[in-house]
């Protein structure tokens, strides 16, 4: 008897235990050629020559690699050699023989069942395998000196108290928990921060626009003032020109000569020596 590992793509895959013919077919395929399981098995060659298990030295033993979903299944091998030597003394594999054959067999990865058999296998586990129901958990009984009737009344009261106690619990579930409230509060705080940022941005843009408008208005006022002053000066000049008649060009030259002569006389008088007045003897 040796153990064999059947790796499958979907992990451990079981079939109905009633298909004995398929089980024998798989056993005949695997036992004569143990080298097919080379990545997953190894041979035990260190077997004493005088031990009764020498006939099983060429069998393969499983070696489960890490990271592969495997299921170990015990397969019984038919040994054609006479077993007289093994009947006298139990060998090292006697404890394995005591184990019962598995009730279910693995589904080989290289063989697909026919559609009819697949339908039977899909419907079989619900009928063949008994459903294991969990034992009903009972409350610990306390030894009291009351009779059976008093104990029944006490049990009914405790049941009513349990029903009434579940109502506040359901109401508490309906109320928002502090964790959810904190999440909603954080969301409201984020929304408020975004609104404040948007309001500040709009306020800055409004202030910049107002500054530009004031600057343009100031420039317009300066231009209007300059134009108005220029118009006023021009009107004053026109009024003064109407009152004083303009002299002809010849008279202007004479006026200039007379003004020059006056300036020269004033300068000669200014720089002339002081003449002392004569005094009588």
From Swiss-Prot:
Low complexity composition bias: residue spans: 165-178
UniProtKB keywords: Membrane, Transmembrane, Transmembrane helix
Membrane-traversing stretches: 207-227
Membrane topology according to the record: Single-pass membrane protein
Location of the region described as Disordered in the Swiss-Prot/TrEMBL record: 107-131, 150-187
PANTHER family named in the record: CMT1A DUPLICATED REGION TRANSCRIPT 15 PROTEIN-LIKE PROTEIN
Protein name: CMT1A duplicated region transcript 15 protein-like protein
Name of the coding gene: CDRT15L2
């Amino acid at each position: 008897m040796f153990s064999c590992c059947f790796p499958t793509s979907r992990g451990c895959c079981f079939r109905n235990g009633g298909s004995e013919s398929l089980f024998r077919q798989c056993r005949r395929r695997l036992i004569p050629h143990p080298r097919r399981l080379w990545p997953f098995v190894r041979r035990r060659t260190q077997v004493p020559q005088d031990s009764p298990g020498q006939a099983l030295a060429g069998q393969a033993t499983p070696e489960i690699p890490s990271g592969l979903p495997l299921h170990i299944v015990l397969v019984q091998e038919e040994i054609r050699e006479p077993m007289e030597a093994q009947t006298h003394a139990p060998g090292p594999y006697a404890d394995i023989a005591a184990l019962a054959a598995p009730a279910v067999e693995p589904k080989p990865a290289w063989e697909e069942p026919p559609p009819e058999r697949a339908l039977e296998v899909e419907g079989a586990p619900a009928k063949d395998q008994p459903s294991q129901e969990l034992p009903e958990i009972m409350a610990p009984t306390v030894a009291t000196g009351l009779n059976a009737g008093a104990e029944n009344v006490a049990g009914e009261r405790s049941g009513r108290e349990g029903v009434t106690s579940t109502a506040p619990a359901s109401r508490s579930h309906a109320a928002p928990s502090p964790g959810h409230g904190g999440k909603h509060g954080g969301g409201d705080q984020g929304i408020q921060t975004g609104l404040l940022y948007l309001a500040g941005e709009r306020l800055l843009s409004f202030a910049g626009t107002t500054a530009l408008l004031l600057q343009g208005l100031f420039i317009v006022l300066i231009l209007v003032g300059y134009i108005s002053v220029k118009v006023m000066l021009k009107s004053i000049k026109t009024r003064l020109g109407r009152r004083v008649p303009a002299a002809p060009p010849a008279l202007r030259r004479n006026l200039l000569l007379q003004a020059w002569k006056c300036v020269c006389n004033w300068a000669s008088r200014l720089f002339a020596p002081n003449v002392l007045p004569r005094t009588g003897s």
